[in-house]
Amino acid sequence: MASGYLCLVLHWHLPFVRHPEHPRFLEEDWLFEAISETYIPLLSVFERLEAQGIPFRLTISVSPTLAEMLRDGFLQERYLAHLDRLIELAGREVRRTRDDLAINRLAVMYLERFTTCRTLFVDKYERNLLKGLIHFQRSGNLDLITSSATHCFLPLFQVVPQAVKAQIQVAVRSHIRTFDSYPKGFWLPECGYYPGVEEFCRQYDLDYFFVESHGVLYADKRPKYGVYAPIYCPNRVAAFARDPETAKAVWSSEGGYPGDPVYREFYRDIGFDLPTDDLKEFLPGGELRSNTGIKYHAITGPGERKRVYNPKAAEKRVHEHAEHFVSARIEQVRRVAGFMDRPALVVCPFDAELFGHWWFEGPQWLESLLRKTAARRDELAMITPGEYLQRWPELQTSQPCFSSWGNKGYAEVWLEGSNDWVYRHLHQQALRMSELARRFPKEKGIRRRALNQAFREMLLAQASDWPFIMKMGTTVPYAVRRTREHIHNFTRIYDSLMTNSLDQEWLFSVESKNKLFPEIDYQSYVA
């Protein structure tokens, strides 16, 4: 038995963005960047480890909205068009930078990366990256779990519990259809927990979820093992707490690994550095500057002046940081061993997009970490929450407290002056959806389609991504537009059903655009 265990959890999520009404849409690039920079690199890490017989165990939560986009043929085609543009742009960069050896080497690196992404996407994964996840689930390397249907921040919907239930119910059904397996765990979006949400988890046979550290540390009974073991809620659904030491080492913008000066600078991209005329063919609309993924500079320091990125120096630092992380975790579990009657558990949940997208070297670091952990598994072994609960089923029972991993630890990010206006509409929608389901209990044909689409629009409006963007001040007009659009669509369907004036042509256009959750059933909303 190992001295301690490491539970590594990667959360794969993006909001549902799909715009067939436009030939190209900037926000669809969120998905395309994540595929090229995070999802394919992570799957490649798993492929190399498997090929070399190196054991690894991870938990990956896949949000239903992301799964729907990854399987969507329309978005798969658009991703290939996106890649083809990048391959052409990288080829031009190789020619443009031929007189600058250091920059030219990087241009060649990007050309090779984009070309490899295309080959893997088409030939290996047959355009569907979910196949890669399913393979590693069946091999026993990954434990796949789900999250709420549209990544709703559940604590702000406890006043309409039918909405919380619907988010979890639709998520579980979507996961079964996607992965042909039942999820045993649940990722609370933003680790947003409120007392009582575990009742819906138990209703759908979800055995565990994750919370921020203080969700367990401030539970109604002081946790005997702190964050080093899960606790049971009163209904025996387990809550696993995020370890604050590892969160600081990896997440911190000041002292965390991703901020090292030799690593690649995220915010210097040729999409902003080169003259617009040189990029017209590659920018949305020919003039809207955006990230291309081609970046030539290292973080260097806080100032404007940046050194040219050196991949070899970065690779060396990756292994140093992986060694530091593993050694620190071994020391950590040894430090608390005297206070425990079981091996300490260190829970490390992360947004997957940190690895590769925000932190370019993240997949390399993860691979090095997994290799080093495998080599020292007598001291620190990988484990999934399900395995932990099988080995140590007797846990302390306590009631976690309201918490999230957002700024200041509660709900301030998703409920404040920039976004508080949405909730009166979202709560009213949830109540009106109940009204529709009761008033039209056994509809068929076009009315049933309308009711199911109303259900979809309600769920899409509840996504936590939109209030988050409003708070952070990034693509605010888009987040506001999406929220209003789904509220409008729902309201129009509601009004038309109440007045028997359904516009079929309009309904078909909305179904075609917001095309997800084909198994959705409005009748289940009040079941």
Regions found by a protein language model. Name each.
Residues 2-57, 62-108, 112, 221-527:
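Active-site and substrate-binding clefts of carbohydrate-active enzymes
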